[in-house]
Curated annotation (Swiss-Prot):
Encoding gene (name): pup
The protein's name: Prokaryotic ubiquitin-like protein Pup
Native species: Corynebacterium kroppenstedtii (strain DSM 44385 / JCM 11950 / CIP 105744 / CCUG 35717)
InterPro entries reported in the protein's UniProt record: Ubiquitin-like_Pup (IPR008515)
Sequence segments annotated as region (ARC ATPase binding): 18-56
Pathway membership: Protein degradation; proteasomal Pup-dependent pathway
UniProt KW keywords: Isopeptide bond, Ubl conjugation pathway
Source organism, top-level taxon: Bacteria
Length: 62
């Protein structure tokens, strides 16, 4: 009789089985963070647009 052994464990790629879900979650978090930052910039521009433009021009537009 042949002796067969089975090893139960993970394959090299198995530990990242849920990676697409994680990547989607991280992408959404990054997008939300970017949206929040843009909203904050919009708010600053609405309240201090003239000052923002003045300081931007003083720095040479860079």
């Amino acid at each position: 009789m042949e002796k067969s052994s089975q090893i139960h464990g993970s394959k090299p790629g198995d530990d990242n089985a849920d990676e697409p879900e994680n990547a989607a979650g991280q992408s959404q978090i990054r997008k939300q963070g970017a949206d929040d930052l843009l909203d904050e910039i919009d708010g600053l521009l609405e309240s201090n647009a003239e000052e923002f433009v003045r300081s931007y021009v003083q720095k040479g537009g860079q």
